[in-house]
Structure formats: C-alpha cells, structure tokens
C-alpha cells in the first residue's frame, strides 16, 4: 500500500498530466497549501519561467493578515496573483490544484483570481 506522501504525489501528477493535455500553450496557475500559508504562481511551462507569484508571506500581505491559513488570506493571495499576472500580460490560464481538492482555501483563491481578471 502506498504511503500518504506517495499517494499525494501520484494524485498531483495525474492532475498535471491532464492539464498538459488541455493547456494548449496557456500558462498554469499552480497552488500550494501548507498548514500555515498558501502560495500561488503563474508558470509558463513552455519557457520554464514563473510569470507571477504571490503568497501569504509577501510583504504586501503579511502585515494585514491575522493568519495565512484561512479563506480570507487565500482570497487576498488570489487577487494579488491575478493583479501581478495581468501586469505580466497573462489573462488566460489553466488552474493547477495539485493534489488538493477544490474546496475551502483552494476554491477561495480560485474565485478571487477569477474576480481579479484571470480566466480559467
């Protein structure tokens, strides 16, 4: 039986394999959630470059947050990454949730990124 870490890695690889088939050259909005923070970055896989990034550890957000581990913090990160992506000229992305289910903080970040101007 696979360990929890192996199962998460397998699920993340399955999601990314599907994304590559539907991406059509679009950059991906990759999300990582830890117990204390949330991170998001827009990655151009063709060029191998990060186009925009934001997290609850950014100086812009750190002072205004009570904690980096709630849906309000995730929504602020989503709005910030959408703003930075639009400055980089990116509006259309594919959403890479990794091994995380689309619920709670991940959903809050995605909804805020959509409101900020990203389409996926």
From Swiss-Prot:
GO CC, any one term: cytosolic large ribosomal subunit
Superkingdom of this protein's organism: Bacteria
Subunit (UniProt): Part of the 50S ribosomal subunit; part of the 5S rRNA/L5/L18/L25 subcomplex. Contacts the 5S and 23S rRNAs.
UniProt name for this protein: Large ribosomal subunit protein uL18
Gene expressing this chain: rplR
GO biological process: translation
Alphabetical list of Pfam families matching this protein: Ribosomal_L18p
Molecular function (Gene Ontology), one example: structural constituent of ribosome
């Amino acid at each position: 039986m696979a360990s929890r870490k192996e199962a998460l890695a397998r699920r993340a690889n399955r999601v990314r394999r599907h994304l590559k088939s539907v991406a059509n050259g679009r950059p991906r909005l990759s999300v990582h959630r830890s117990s204390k923070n949330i991170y998001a970055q827009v990655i151009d896989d063709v060029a191998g470059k990060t186009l925009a990034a934001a997290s609850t550890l950014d100086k812009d957000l750190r002072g205004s947050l009570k904690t980096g581990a709630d849906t309000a913090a995730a929504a602020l990160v989503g709005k910030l990454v959408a703003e930075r992506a639009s400055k980089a000229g990116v509006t259309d992305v594919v959403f890479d949730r990794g091994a995380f289910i689309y619920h709670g903080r991940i959903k809050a970040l995605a909804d805020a990124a959509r409101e900020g101007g990203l389409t996926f």
